[in-house]
Amino acid sequence: MFKGVSPINVDAKGRMAMPAKYRERLKDLCEGRLVLTVDFGGCLMLFPEPEWEQLEQKLARLPDLNPKARSLKRLLMGHASDCELDGHGRILLPSVLREYAGLDKRIVLVGQGNKFEIWDEETWNGSRDAWLAEVAAGEGVLPEELETLSF
């Protein structure tokens, strides 16, 4: 559904313009209603509202007596912020979430199928280079589901 890497500028009010190639799809999919929350990798995750609602239902079913499950719910649901594309195709990135991900003027929007990741551009470039080096060096263990993947 969503793919590609798009460098974007954040304006002085903390807004980012959604690339034009995604705007129509988002209007059709969710009328421009999105949910933004934290990711454990130091970036933000941006979900179309229907995708977020599915995740939220899964999170709600996690047992509150399990400390890890409760922490996950606190982080993802507690930081969740409703966003809507304005008439110019922009969304406001709340200051608390911009601060969490270290977002300033230059960010990168990364399509991840059913959602987007939003990274500080410098952090993205460093992480991407590290991931490429890991793959080239054959480091890490692939999950069983990926062992037969070929391209």
Where are the regions a protein language model picked out?
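C-terminal end-helix/capping segment
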Residues: 111-137
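A short beta-strand-loop micro-motif that forms or neighbors metal/cofactor-
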Residues: 28-43, 80, 102-119
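Beta-rich strand-turn-strand
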Residues: 81-90, 95-104
